[in-house]
Amino acid sequence: MSLKKNQLRAILNSSLGKLADHIIDSQSISICKQVVELPEWKRCKNVCLYMNMPKKEVRTRCLIDVAFKEGKNVFIPKCIGSHVMEMYQVFEKTESLTINKWGIAEPNGESRKIMDDETDCELIIVPGVAFDEKLSRLGHGKGYYDNYISKYQSWALQKESRANMFKVGICLKEQILPNREIPMDTRDQKLDALVTPEKVIRNI
């Protein structure tokens, strides 16, 4: 993990922490409207979403509500160890979520998870601290999503018939670095698409 990444995180976390709730809410609604129009969203049966932090990132309640309304199976992450997470299924009327040390709701780990019983993840919605227009992502530095995506891809490759995971980042306008590339290393996963409040950027 380079100093440059840490510097970017510090700068972005400081500015994002100052964003008013109404700005985050407005941008989150715009992002939700674009995500649910993606062809990958429309055709997926299983979708991996995330429960947002109290501040600093796109709010996902709208996406979760739409996914349930459309009859999709919804999976959200639970951190189960150092740099390790799993995606567990949650249900519309669930009361089994707990709050972790980062203030994020997560499942209790007792339901079905992706890769159990050949369960595919066709679409994963990925948070982050910063993004660039070349579909690079800067996370929080723990490697949870990079490690999980790598593990899923290895599993899907072995199974051959399993669905490829389409990776969509969602970000506030303030999280985009328009004139700067995020430093990447061999473990970092590129996105397939990035949805901002104003546009969709795809890996063509």
UniProtKB/Swiss-Prot annotation:
Taxonomic classification: Eukaryota, Fungi, Dikarya, Ascomycota, Taphrinomycotina
Catalytic activity field: (6S)-5-formyl-5,6,7,8-tetrahydrofolate + ATP = (6R)-5,10-methenyltetrahydrofolate + ADP + phosphate
Family, as annotated: Belongs to the 5-formyltetrahydrofolate cyclo-ligase family.
Name used for this protein in its record: Probable 5-formyltetrahydrofolate cyclo-ligase
Organism the protein comes from: Schizosaccharomyces pombe (strain 972 / ATCC 24843)
One BP term from GO: folic acid-containing compound biosynthetic process
Residues that coordinate or bind ATP: K5, N6, Q7, L8, R9, G139, H140, G141, K142, G143, Y144, Y145, D146, D188
Any Pfam family: 5-FTHF_cyc-lig
This protein's UniProt keywords: ATP-binding, Ligase, Nucleotide-binding
